[in-house]
């Protein structure tokens, strides 16, 4: 995307079939575009800046936004055809099975007048851009216009309720296992769950060098459509995760009533992670189980299910989809949709004697947009908590800091109220008995019942997708698991949260923002710190008995600094070894750890994880696995040497920072990549703070990056307002060949951030173009 002089003439709405009949009441506004394509949107009121946000999102992400709309409508096959391997058809069937389009319209009606004004203003901005710039809307996307308020609520529901929640709770893998072998296969399922999660730190004044609260927010998600691993039809559906950074300023530009900055998902009419001059917040994925699968027992006709000793009829409806054909015609396809009292039926067994129904939280909470605008406008912790107490967001931890020196943590979302005798082991990673009414949750906890902490004694809160119990150490009583039902969350602390908590708790002097940034950018592999010593001892001993490969591996690992810095040698060998070990744990060749394995399987440790020593355990390798651990090390040495020319290859020789551009209505991947730079940063299981998710491409002989460290905000709340810096690794645009896909990479590569522009004078000085809307 380049800003092209911006035609001022308003073209007739009929050019693209747009209607202004339901336009929101707004005033003229102005967008100041900075050099990184961040829109600084000025207007007199909320509807005006929201209209500008819709306009700006189209300017930066028109193809991605309209693709997201098409999918959330359940009509992508109608617009784009069946897709590779029938992807679009299957996706639309899923959206319709979930009932997203109809419920999205209900949310519009139920959400109240304020929310409707925001939704309509955003749509007006989207449609205004399309009307002004018809040549910038690809022919294959024009039929999707105009965008209407229910498109925004359907996108919200599709992304949060029906994508985030099921993926976090491992629903897709569980369904696949059940279809292959029923409940026994589910119980045997060896899970490899990576927390598509984040880092969030709130640092109180006592730990801050300037005596001001500091907030570090760092969501870890796929890099939207700017990542390289999907080569057709955006089949990975990563566009739903694409951030856009924006600055919304209301009132007098020099003394605004609101000056809010941050990011939102494409299609979002609010700031989802961000800050104003008084406070800020970030989110991390929490260990909440609120997307549950229930096994239904069907009668002989397959049309009724057993519930509480009585057979109830499955609700049956049909939906007719249009599927675009290569010759331009449309083929109609009818699908059957079934619902039980639990939720939509998502799978049947082959004999149609059993089925799975999926129940997700938050479907009766229509006012997410209102909640986030209340959060954005808050100036104090009580105001912010009052806004969040609406619990319209079914998910996420919240980490918060403010100008008054407060820090706050909330285990947020819609937490089901379950029978008191259930434990986390009973409800996580399983299929519930759909015949038992006691297991069907109908209520969720109130805000006051959720784990939370305000200004804990350690003067920090830190969450990296760990359960709430270890988010503040020393542990305050409000985060003591003994005070909550045992089914809320398991007890564990993986290596990345240990890394962050150790950094914050071990600081011997108050931290500057520069020191916080250094900690946030750490590529140290905490996993390696715990196990490499035992591995070297094992390999050295084997070398003395003639295993020259083990001896060579030991030499590399001994010299390694345990980081994933681009110039560090040894990390790729350790990575290859660990991946083989995890595969052997899954295959039963290596005995598994049971103390700290919620996200990813671990081999048995010599010292297991302990809640009494949460940031120093687990450690070591259990000797019972030594033989296979050594086999895997020899294999890893051979594999690494074959793949990269040397087993001592540096991290950046094996791993590259890769961003791409896409073309066409369905956003086909374009070669060559826009970037191919030596990377610093490892995958989550290894325990770095700076996470980058790798994907090995054999044809390239390297790992490419597809997610992880995306948005970063580091904000200090001074008496004069918020000051700090931000970064969006994969850029603030996704339009074909946009220069703003890669223009923030120099910051990412150098592990720095760009300044957050917080005053009108700074915005004016940095503006490369100015646009009225």
Question: Which positions does each model-derived feature cover?
Answer:
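N-terminal secretory signal peptides that target proteins for export/translocation
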Residues: 1-5
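Acidic, low-complexity N-terminal propeptides/linkers enriched in Ser/Thr/Asp/Gly that mediate export
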Residues: 115-227, 235, 391, 403-420, ...
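Glycine- and hydrophobic-rich flexible loops that cap the catalytic core of alpha/beta enzyme folds
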Residues: 248-258, 263, 274-432
